Every structure is written in C-alpha cells, then in structure tokens.
C-alpha cells in the first residue's frame, strides 16, 4: 500500500478518535460545566486532526483515485473524517458560546 494512502488512513483514524473525544468532552461538560480544560483540549485536537486529514487527502493523486480503489477510498475516508472532526469542534464552539466560555489553547 502506498505511503500516501497509509497516511490518509492514519489521519482519518486520528480524526475519528478526536471527534469521539469531543463528544465525550461535551457529555462531561453537561455534568460538570467547569471541566473546560477537557473541552478546550478536545477542540484543538479536532482542529489538528481535521488539518492532518485535509493535508493527507490533498497529497493523494486525484487522477490515480479514478483507477486505484485504495487511493479513492483513502481520499473518501479522510474527507469524511475531517468533516466529522470539524463538526464536533463546531459543536464545542456552540457549547462554549452557550456557557459563556472562551476556548483556550
């Protein structure tokens, strides 16, 4: 398997895990609204994973994706995982606004 495909798949796994961390952080914040150190970390984790997925997907050859199922699939899963990480980060932003919290590094 090509290195670029492996990178895209690894980035997708990381983004999916980051999205799960964001969901867990939101659930924690519903119970304990002062636990923003976890929410902040999950937000930045999602953004970093999103960027990694986008970069890995961009590194794949679009012409090769037309004929190589591995490349096509890697591009697809990286794109979907990037979007999920983005969506979960946005959910944390919405919660932060609702609770009058500023997400910090």
Please report, for each region that a protein language model flagged, where it lies by residue:
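Long, low-complexity or tandemly repetitive, helically biased scaffold regions used
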Residues: 1-105
């Amino acid at each position: 398997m090509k290195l670029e495909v492996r990178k895209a798949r690894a980035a997708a796994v990381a983004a999916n895990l980051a999205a799960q961390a964001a969901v867990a952080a939101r659930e924690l914040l519903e119970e304990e609204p002062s636990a923003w150190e976890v929410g902040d970390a999950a937000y930045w984790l999602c953004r970093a994973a999103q960027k990694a997925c986008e970069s890995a997907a961009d590194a794949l050859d679009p012409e090769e994706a037309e004929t190589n199922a591995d490349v096509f699939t890697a591009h697809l899963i990286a794109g979907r995982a990037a979007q999920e990480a983005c969506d979960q980060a946005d959910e944390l932003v919405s919660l932060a606004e609702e609770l009058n919290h500023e997400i910090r590094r």
